[in-house]
Amino acid sequence: MTKFTEKATAITPNREIQPDEYFNETDHLIYCSKCNTPRQCRHELQGKVLIPSIRCKCQQEIFEQEEAQRKLHEKQMEIKHLKTSGLQDKALYDYTFSKDNGINPEIKLAHNYVSNWEEMKSNASGLLIWGDVGTGKSFFAGCIANALLEKGIPVLMTNFSRILNTLTGMHFEDRNQFINSLNRYSLLIIDDLGIERNSDFALEQVFNVIDSRYRSKKPLIITTNLTLSELNNAADIAHKRIYDRILERCIPVRINNRNIRQDNATANLKQAKKILLNNHAPNQN
């Protein structure tokens, strides 16, 4: 008998053998009865033989499955938290690529923006999505927001009316702190630029938000009913400095589509009319 075998034989397992285990007389280790792989290993350290417990093959498979489920749950909770924080209107949850009806050819640009996000982020490249009312600009931006949020990327989609309501009544320091907090998001999406009130205070705060984002070197997406000509030919200095900041970093994308909102409303009215005409009034007796 060798010296190594003598040591191994002299040392007994440091725990009881369970019903689903057996003791291997060859290497003196406990094995799993199901997969026939060891649940112990042998180490020699400073002349002493140590026999710690390890996972057998089937235990390792169960562990990996449970670990995958745990990570998936954590990821789902993270995404849920990001969406709660980043999508301030519940309707935005439905603005996803899977809900696209295929009538907007420009949607491929939204796909490309998401696919090339790391490069867009690195270059602080944003989008200026412009076009008539109801053509799907918010849906376009929302698809980008949801796709990135599903990847665990912090996105905030809001509008200046909401931002201005928050800033109104704040002290100067608090306003700056709030505006700076918007830069915690990897992508900031401002929906419907131009519908906010046009006071001096509003214009100043709109510029502060845009300028802060510009200086943070993080991408910004803007949607607006304003035309590119109106943005390039601002009526005054206050608007010009806002638009210049946007145009410097945001790639213009025109959504030249039918009025989807009007089409949907018309379809809903037709369906309601059909229901009214095809159904008899309930018996009131």
PLM region spans:
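Hydrophobic/aromatic beta-strand patches that form the interior of the parallel beta-sheet core
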Residues: 127, 156, 189, 221, ...
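Loop/turn-to-beta-strand initiation segments
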Residues: 153-154, 184-187, 216-222
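Short glycine-rich substrate-engagement loop in P-loop NTPases that contacts/grips substrate
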Residues: 105-114, 124, 145-185, 197-204
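A short, basic N-terminal segment
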Residues: 1-101, 265-285
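Pre-Walker A (pre-P-loop) alpha-helix and adjacent loop at the N terminus of AAA/AAA+ ATPase modules
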Residues: 87-91, 96-127
